[in-house]
Amino acid sequence: MSNTTVEQFAAELKRPVEDLLKQLKEAGVSKNSGSDSLTLDDKQLLNAYLTKKNGSNGGTISIRRTKTEVSTVDGVKVETRKRGRTVNIPSAEELAAQVKAAQTQAAPVRPEQTAEDAAKARAEAAARAEARAKAEAEAAKLKAAKAGNKAKPAAQKPTEAKAETAPVAAETKPAEESKAEKAQADKMPSKKPAEPKEKAAKPKHERNGKGKDAKKPAKPAAPAVPQPVVSAEEQAQRDEEARRAAALRAHQEALLKEKQERQARREAMKQQAEQQAKAAQEAKTGRQRPAKPAEKPQAAAPALENKPVNPAKAKKENRRNRDDEGQGRNAKGKGGKGGRDRNNARNGDDERVRGGKKGKKLKLEPNQHAFQAPTEPVVHEVLVPETITVADLAHKMAVKGVEVVKALMKMGMMVTINQSIDQDTALIVVEELGHIGKPAAADDPEAFLDEGAEAVEAEALPRPPVVTVMGHVDHGKTSLLDYIRRTKVVQGEAGGITQHIGAYHVETPRGVITFLDTPGHEAFTAMRARGAKATDIVILVVAADDGVMPQTIEAIAHAKAAGVPMVVAVNKIDKEAANPERIRQELTAHEVVPDEWGGDVQFIDVSAKKGLNIDALLEAVLLEAEVLELTAPVDAPAKGIIVEARLDKGRGAVATLLVQSGTLKKGDMLLAGTAFGKIRAMVDENGKSITEASPSIPVEILGLSDVPNAGEDAMVLADEKKAREIALFRQGKYRDVRLAKQQAAKLENMFNNMGENQAQSLSVIIKADVQGSYEALAGSLKKLSTDEVKVNVLHSGVGGITESDVNLAIASGAFIIGFNVRADASSRKLAENENVEIRYYNIIYDAIDDVKAAMSGMLSPEEKEQVTGTVEIRQVISVSKVGNIAGCMVTDGVVKRDSHVRLIRNNVVIHTGELASLKRYKDDVKEVRMGFECGLMLKGYNEIMEGDQLECFDIVEVARTL
C-alpha cells in the first residue's frame, strides 16, 4: 500500500485537516502540514490512540466468517468466495454493559464540528444503541454465540455487513438494515470504476472495526460508546492481507486488461481476414452477407477494459465471448479447416460436424481459441550422445541450426551445420540456449549385446587354463615353449626374437594347457598387455645369468594389473654364471616373494636347452589352475578375444581367436569390434582345418569383413542383421571420435607451432604382416621424435605394399617401411619411376636404427668453438684517424687473419669480435705463428691496454646424432 498525505487521508475520513493534525500530534505522530506524507505505521499509531481513547477490549468469542460477493456482469451472475477470517465478538454480558454505558454517557461537543456531521453521528449512535438494547433483551434467551452473531452486524463496518453470508435468526431491525446495506453495496462495483487509492485505503479502516466512526472519529454530538477493537497483531495481519489482496487485484486487472487488448487485436485481424474472404466470395457468387457477429466482441472489449473484474468473472466473460465467436463462424458456414482443425485435434476434441461443401463446421470448446500463441519459452530435455552433429542438436532442441552455429561461434568455435561436436561442448550449447542437457548414449544398438548375454544361461564345465609366457627379451621364453611343444619355433623367428603372439595348446598327462607366447622387446608393450588380459596364469621367465631386466619388471606390472597369479621359471641354470638365489632376491624387491620364503609365488629352476625340471613347471601350472577352479559354459554361443589379426593376400582377413566361453563352430556369425562375418574356415595352430573349438582353445578364423583390432572382444550372434547394424554403428562412432581427435590435434599443433620455427618432419608409411607388429613399430618410431625432427606416421596397416601406399608416399614425400611384407610388381615399378624409397625389414631393431640415422641427418649441425692460439699485447700505438694498434707476441698456436678473438683482461672477457688487420713489419699477412711478433687491430673496438691477452678461435660445425 502506497503512502498518502495528511490532506488526502483527511479527505477520505471527511474530517478537517487541522483536526486530523491535532489527533496525530496527540497520538505521537509529528506532522506539521497537510502535505506531509502519512505512512502505514503512522496510521496504525493513530488507530491505537483512538482505540485507547474511546474504549478497551473486552471478552471476545471467536467465530469463522466467510465473505461472498455476488455481482452481475452483462446479465451473468458471478459469485466469488473469499478466504475465511476469524473475527472476535464480545460476549452478551459485556455487550449489555456497553449499551448501558452508551445510554448514560455522552461525549462533549466540539465547536469546530458542523451541524450536519453532528446530526449524522447522533442518528448512527441512536441506531447502535437501539440495536445493542435489543441484543441485551435477547441475550438471556439465546446462546452467547448466537447473541453475538445478531448483535455484531449492526456494530460492524458497512463492508463487513456486505460480506456476511450467514443469515440472522431473528428478523430484527439491525438485520434488516444490514440487508439493505448489503444490497446497496452489491450495486456499487458496477456503478463505480476501480479507484486504486480508495480501494487500498478503505479496507484498512473498515477492518479496524470502527465503521463510519473511522471516517469521523470522536464527533461532538455522538456519545462516546466503547467500541470492541482488535489487537495490534491482528490489525497488522489484516493490513498485510489487505495489501496482498490489493496487489493481487491490481495484478489480475492488469493481466485481464492485457488479455482483453490482445483478444481485441486478434478479433480485429480475424474480422479483417473474414471480410477479405467474404469480399472474394461475393465477387464469385454476387451475394453479400453481413459480418455483424464478428463485430460484437470488438465492441464489447472497450467497455470491459475499465472494469475491475475478478478472475472468475473474467473467465466466464471470456467464455461467453468465445461462444459468440464460435456462433459467428458457424453462421457463416466456413472455417472448419486449417489451423483450427489441427489445434482442435491436438487438444483431444473431435466434435466436428461434417456436411456438404458449405456445411463443414468445427465446434470449438467455449474456453478454446482457434489459434494458440505460445506464451512462454518451451524448455526441452535434450539427450546428448558422445558425438552429435550441429544439425541433429538443433533438431533435438527444436531450433534452427543457425542458432546453434551462432552459439558455437560465440564460444570461439567455427563450425558448419554438418560438423560433429563432442558431448561436453553440446551440453554447454544446450544450457546456453535455455534447455536442459543430459548425457546419454542415444540409439546404441550395443545394448542388445547385454540383453542377449543375460538371456543365455548354460552349465559351466571345467576348462583348460590359459598360460601366458612373459619375460625380458632373450631370456628363453620361446625356447621353453619349444621344448614343451617339441618344435623349433625359435628358428622361424627373424633374429631369434619373437615378434608375434603365438597361441598353442599342449596335451599333457594331467590335461590340456593353452600357451600364449608374448614378445619381450620393449616395443611390444601393447602385445604383452593383451596377453595378460586374456590369460589365467603367467609364467615369468627370468634368465639366471642375466637377472631382473626392464621388461621383466613391466611383465610383473601387467600380471598384477590383470590380477593373474604368477609362476616364476628361472631359466638357463645350466650356465656357469647362473645364480638362482640372486634372481629370488631381486624379484623379492619387486614384491614377488618365493613360497619357500613365506610368499605365494612358486619358483622353478629350469633349463629350456636341456629340458631340466620342465615337468615340475607344468605341475606347478596345473596346481595353480586347480586352485583357480576354472570353468566356462560349453553349450552356448561362443565368446572370445582377438589375440592377433592380419591380412592375408589369398585368404583375406585372418584373426587368431582365443575362445573363452561357449563353443565356436564353422558357419557362426561372429562380431569382433567393427568387423563381422560368417566363419568360412577354422584352422588350429598346426594348420589343420577344424569345425569347432571349445573354451581355452586358440584358432585362426577366416571370413571377417575387415581386419579386427587385436584385443577386441568377439562374440557369436544369431542375427546377421543385428551384427551388421552394431558393426556399422561402431564404425561411425569410431570415425566421429577419430575426427574430433584429429581436429583437436590440429588446433593444438597450430598453437604449439605459433611463433616458433616449424620442426622438420620425417614422414613414414608402415605396412606389416600382423597388427601387433605395425603397432609396436609405429610406437617405437614416434618415441624417436624430438623438438627439431618429428616422425610422422602417415599410415600403418596390415598386408602387402600396394599402389595406393606408393601414391600416398608420392603425395606426402614419405618413405615406406615393409615389415615382413613385400610390394607387388606394379607397386615396385611405380615406386622406381617416382623415386619413392621402400625399405624392407624383418627385425624391429634394424628399422628403428635406420629411421634414427635418417633423423640424425635431418638435424641442423651444431656449432663449436676451436681455440687456435693466444696473443699477448705488449705495446699500444695510437694513430690519428686510424685508432689503436696493438703490438703483440704470439704466445701459443697461430693467429689467422679471419679468426675470431676475445679480449681478456685480468682473466675476464672484455670483448668478443674479429680482427680488422694483421701485419708483420708493415706487410699484411694471413697468419702469424707462435714466437713471432705482429701488429693487429680489432674491428670496431679501441679500448685495448698493455698486458691484455687475445684468444683466437674458429667456429666449426659438428654433425649431431640422436
Curated annotation (Swiss-Prot):
Biased composition annotated in UniProt, kind: Basic and acidic residues: 117-141, 173-216, 235-269, 338-354
G4: region residues: 571-574
Record localization: Cytoplasm
Gene3D superfamilies per the UniProt record, alphabetical: P-loop containing nucleotide triphosphate hydrolases, Putative DNA-binding domain, N-terminal subdomain of bacterial translation initiation factor IF2, Translation factors, Translation initiation factor IF- 2, domain 3
Occurrences of domain tr-type G (ranges): 462-631
Alphabetical UniProt keywords: Cytoplasm, GTP-binding, Initiation factor, Nucleotide-binding, Protein biosynthesis
GO cellular component terms, semicolon-separated: cytosol
SUPFAM superfamilies (alphabetical): Initiation factor IF2/eIF5b, domain 3, P-loop containing nucleoside triphosphate hydrolases, Putative DNA-binding domain, Translation proteins
Record's compositionally biased regions (Low complexity): 145-155, 219-234, 270-283
Region listing for Disordered, in residue ranges: 99-365
GTP-binding in keyword set: yes
Chain intervals for the UniProt region annotation (G1): 471-478
Pfam families xref list: EF-G_D2, GTP_EFTU, IF-2, IF2_N
Binding sites annotated in the UniProt record for GTP: 471-478, 517-521, 571-574
Primary residence: cytoplasm
Summary of the function given for this chain in its UniProt record: One of the essential components for the initiation of protein synthesis. Protects formylmethionyl-tRNA from spontaneous hydrolysis and promotes its binding to the 30S ribosomal subunits. Also involved in the hydrolysis of GTP during the formation of the 70S ribosomal complex.
Protein name: Translation initiation factor IF-2
Organism the protein comes from: Neisseria meningitidis serogroup C (strain 053442)
Species lineage: Bacteria, Pseudomonadati, Pseudomonadota, Betaproteobacteria, Neisseriales
